Amino acid sequence: MRNILAVSLVLTAVLAAAIAAPRAASPSSDYTIQAIRYAELPDFPLSELVVGGPQGEKIDIAMVIWLIRGEGRNILFDSGFHRQSWFKYFPMKDFLQPDEAVKLAGVQPEEVTDIVISHAHWDHMGGIDLFPKATVWIQKEEFRYYTGEAWQAGGHHGGIDPEDVQELVRINTEGRLRLVDGDNQEILPGIRVFTGSRHTYASEYLLVSGAKPFVLASDNCYLYRNLEKHMSSATFSEADHQANIQNQARMIELAGSADRVVPGHDALQFQRFPSEGRIAKIR
C-alpha cells in the first residue's frame, strides 16, 4: 500500500511539474531564410569594418536585407534604405529599392508582416516606410535613445537619419511598433533577439531556431573576417570593442557553428550559400 501511495505521489508531482512548465518554443524547422542583396557599395575601407584591420585595403560590401518565411509570416530582418540624401555620401552600385527587391523573392511589400530592426542606422532602418502593413520590432532602449537623448548635447546620432526617426515615431502612433525589452527575448515563435554587441546604443542580432539554427548578425558582425580573426566590428564607443568580440563568440555558440553565423555586409554569403541573382538561400 505504501509503495502504491509513493508511486501515486511521484506521478502527481511529475504531472504538476509538466503542467506548470512553460511551453517550449517552436523549433521553427519550417522557417526559410533568404539574403537579398539590394545594392553594392564599392571600395569601402576595410579598417572601418574590422577594428585594427589593415589600413588602405578596400572591399566591395553587400547591402542586404534578410527574408524569413514560416509560421504564416513574412519577416524582414532590417529594411534597407531609399532616401536620396545618402547616395552622395555612399555611391551605390546596382541599387534596387528594398520593396522592389523583396518582390524578386515572391513577396509583395504589403505582404511583409514583420520587420525586425537590428539598429537605427540609415541603411538598416531607412526602408520601414516601404512596407505599409508590417509590425516593426526594435529594442526599447534603441528607440528611447534615438528618439530623444541622441539629439541632446553630448548625444551621439552619427548614421541616424532624422526622417527615419520620425517615421519610427509615426509607426508607433499607428500601433505597429513593438519595443523589445532587452537580451534573449523570443519575439515570434522560434525567433529570438540578443543584445550586447553595442554596434549602436542598443543594437540586436537575431537567432532563427530549428534543427540547424542560424544567427543573422547584421552590423554586430560586419564580415566573416571579424569572426575568423576575432576582431571587433565598429561599436557605439571604443569601450565596447571587447563586448563585440565576446558576442561574436556567443553568436557561434547560439548557432552551433561559425558557418551558421551570417555577417551583415559580407558579399561572401552569396558565394557560401546557393544563390541566384540577388538572392542567396541561407536555409
Predicted regions and their residues:
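Positively charged n-region of N-terminal signal peptides that target proteins for export
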Residues: 1-4
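Bacterial N-terminal signal peptides
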Residues: 7-17
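Metallo-beta-lactamase
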Residues: 18-107, 111-123, 141-195, 211-220, 256-260, ...
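Active-site metal-binding loops of divalent metal-dependent hydrolases
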Residues: 38-39, 79-82, 120, 141-142, ...
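Cap/insert and terminal regions of metallo-dependent hydrolase folds
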Residues: 95, 203, 207-283
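Short, conserved loop/helix-junction motifs that constitute active-site signature segments
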Residues: 129-132
